[in-house]
UniProtKB/Swiss-Prot annotation:
GO CC field: plasma membrane
Species this chain originates from: Methanothermobacter thermautotrophicus (strain ATCC 29096 / DSM 1053 / JCM 10044 / NBRC 100330 / Delta H) (Methanobacterium thermoautotrophicum)
Protein name per the record: Uncharacterized transporter MTH_1382
Main localisation: membrane
An individual GO BP term: transmembrane transport
Record's bilayer topology term: Multi-pass membrane protein
Keyword Transmembrane helix belongs to the record: yes
Amino acid sequence: MIFMGSTETVLSVLVLVLLGYILKVLGVLGEEDASTLNRVVINVAIPSLIFTSLYRADLSGISDLVLIPVICMITGTLSGTIAYLWARRRGLDSGKTWGLTVAAAMMNSGFLGYPVTAGIFGSEGLVRAIFYDTGTTLMFTSLGLLLSHISGGEGSRIMKRAVFFPPLWAFLLGVIFNLWGLPTGIAGTILGYLSGAAVPLIMISLGLTLNFRFLRHSVADATLVSGLRLLISPLMAAGISYVLAFRGLNFSVTVLEASMPSAMLAAVLAIENDLDVDLVSSCIFMSTILSLVSLPLWSVVL
């Protein structure tokens, strides 16, 4: 990807998101089309991007990189715990309580994190973002199993989804092919073409999902989650990274990824576990909109 300044990067992201929203308003695409685009992104485009990036990367410092998903899980757990305690203090029901928890704990480190990080820090930054996003995948699996246990359901569906999650396999294969120096042949060229579709499809899909109608009933809760995701989480990540002696690009990418808004996967957990889907959608929407302001500020600081 071409290295760009932070302002140009976020502006490009905003334009692509708005393009998706405008296409929905004009009736060219519907909100239901987002699920189709998401399937293409998750099963084809993002795995291609992950494999290609890792295959071409310098992984000589992989011992430091493996700490990045650990920081992701720590900051996510702390943010989710704060949201859980807030909800309990307010006496919210279980659906709202756990809805706030998953929205605060899971960040959009892939769908939004990849293009923003790659645009600001280049291909080496993208590699670190991929490692960070692995932590989000582990958070998704852990929360899914926890919620299944609480609701008395079976965790096998979540575990199966995690085991067969295409981005996870792309991550593992990318690292293996890189470290062992395995050739990719024509497959490498094909994956390179497919990886180029990831960013525009991600942003257009995100624009299709923007919906204002849920927000008016959940402003206070969505504001709390947005504050946790966009401000508190990156500050916690900065503190943990400093303690672990992270410096330079490792530090910058880890903090930037921690400042991403609530993940779209939080809505998946809400739907599958009968949580308050409207509340989770409000948190995703507000934090995503506000991140268009906060991300340029964090990129300047970093």
